[in-house]
Amino acid sequence: MRVLLTDPSAFTPTYDHELAAALARAGAEVELVTSRFRFGDAPAPEGYTRSERFYPLSSRLFRRSRLRLPLKAAEHPLGLAALRRRPADVLHLQWLAAPELDVHLFRPHAPAVFTAHDLLPRRTARKADLWRRLLARFERIVVHSERGRETLAALGVDSSRLRVVPHPVFPSDPERRDDGRTVLSFGVIRPYKGLRDAIEAVRRAGDARLLVAGDPLEPLEPYRAAADGLEVEWRLGYLPQPEVDRALGEATVAVFPYRPELDQSGALLRALGAGVPAVAYDVGGVAEPVRRFGAGRVVPPGDVEALAAALRELLSDREALEQARAGARRAREELTWDAAARAHLELYEEIA
């Protein structure tokens, strides 16, 4: 079976790579169609081919500048045309990069699957009719959680087209150097990530240190002011894998006080894959692996005091911490890329 895996904007290059490699190991012929990753080197293909057919100019001329957006919009139809020329038994889109354009321009040329990583992406979440029209063009829609399934069913997506494929963990074995009191806030820094709640929870937790490791896509001054007087280390920018491993190796526990705008968190699954327990708000599907495997604590959304209490417990109770670490290891053993590949191949067979 020839699978055309597509992430036009290279939003999730590590996810794309792991899924493509696992599909190839399972016997599929896989081409990953994407664009140049603007923040570093993309993983080298393993058993699949990778082609950069989207945004050849905007992805190279601009990194963060908003000047790239008009050029990207102009290039988008050319990328879709190039995609249509690629042969496929199944077309699997990881993201709809420009939904306002895609609703007019995107027509699948093969049986199509869409993975709703963010369910309804934040910028266009209020445009329910636009998303109903777009999602109707896919034979199957993959979500990462039961809550994700419920959300899209409530939007009007027929339940027969929805499939839950849990997001695998990203396994790693960083050198463990945690001091028993380090709380990691990890990943891109955006308003929906809840960094202010993480800062306040660490302050209330008592003898704790906060490590903020990630790429800021919003001003940091309010966060620095909120953290005044707190023991905080800031490691900012897009972190290469050795720096990611260093941060995960120093973390006693990771914190995810997200807003209810996404289905799953790659940062959380990196933490679990490294054996680091998580404390998370009960939003979207973020809490599902933590709760299912006992890999940390889940608290009500927006309850900073409950967040602080969960951190305090894991940092002060060695037995509770070890049990949560064992849960993270169970998640790593079960939420594998090979299992996800098998689940995807089953749904591909349904529509090919």
Predicted segments with their positions:
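N-terminal strand-loop element at the rim of the active site
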Residues: 6-74, 99, 148, 215-219
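Carbohydrate-associated surface elements
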Residues: 147, 168
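Conserved donor-binding/catalytic core segment of Leloir-type glycosyltransferases
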Residues: 175-193, 199-207, 211
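Glycosyltransferase donor-sugar binding loop
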Residues: 209-222, 237
